[in-house]
Design a protein with these regions (language model features):
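Conserved nucleotide-sugar phosphate-binding/catalytic loop shared by glycosyltransferases and other
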Residues: 6-12, 29-74, 163
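A short, glycine/small-residue-rich beta-strand->loop->alpha-helix junction that serves as a flexible
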Residues: 9-22, 197
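An aromatic- and histidine-rich active-site surface loop
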Residues: 42-46, 94-115
């Protein structure tokens, strides 16, 4: 029996980072990887109870520059999280680490760089996030959803690999039975947690317009 490859996935605290991480973990597990996920308290709430046994919660914070007190506090928390990550990785060294973006992924990836553990970062936005931008010089590769990623130097182009959005296998294996023509418009809606305004204000107007035009719609 083949020995499982150990992989660690570090995800930020919003849905835009967590769900691609969950989808990546699902795919790696199917390929016989032993997967552990690290996130913060914000990200932890997105996981199902059955999945939480493989999820670790580390403290995290962005670098807050509003005043000296907050700067010192946030910097101390980041340094503590890096130290904790160093200790964890020293005793639980994975073969590969994936950083999915967000400041909660930063300490693990910095610790990986110090310990010379290979890590790959993933960016699903059009503009690279601050954490990923800081990590890019140390990363083996950066996986991107859009080929024309903004905010990175051309000297890192060789590290860029376009993979698209990491979505659920259920969407990839979309059943042909659901595509049978029934004179209805099927709309697939995808979005992160910060797309709430679009979901709440724009999409309802679009759906109402379809209804006014007599178009039957099905939202997936």
């Amino acid at each position: 029996m083949n020995k499982k490859i150990r992989a660690l996935i570090a995800v930020g605290g919003t849905g835009g980072h967590v769900f691609p991480g969950i989808n990546l973990a699902s795919n790696l597990i199917k390929k016989n990887y032993n997967v552990t996920i690290v996130t913060d308290k914000r990200g932890y709430k997105f996981f199902k109870e059955t999945d939480k046994k493989n999820v670790l919660v580390f403290p995290s914070s962005p670098l807050i520059k509003k005043n000296v007190v907050l700067l010192i506090f946030s910097l101390s928390l980041i340094l503590y999280s890096i130290l904790r990550s160093l200790i964890f990785l020293s005793y639980n060294r994975p073969s590969i680490i994936f950083g999915m973006g967000g400041y909660a992924s930063f300490p693990i990836c910095i610790a990986a760089a110090i310990l010379r553990i290979k890590f790959i970062i993933y960016e699903n936005n059009l503009i690279i996030g601050r954490a990923n931008k800081k990590l890019l010089p140390f990363a083996e590769r950066i996986l991107v959803s859009n080929k024309k990623l903004e905010g990175i130097s051309s000297k890192y182009n060789f590290k860029t690999v376009q993979v698209g959005n990491i979505i659920k296998r259920e969407i990839i294996n979309f059943s042909l039975d659901l595509r049978i023509e029934k004179k209805e418009l099927k709309i697939l809606v995808l979005g992160g947690s910060q797309a709430a305004k679009i979901f709440a204000e724009i999409l309802p107007k679009i759906f109402k317009k379809c209804s006014d035009l007599g178009i039957s719609i099905k939202i997936i």
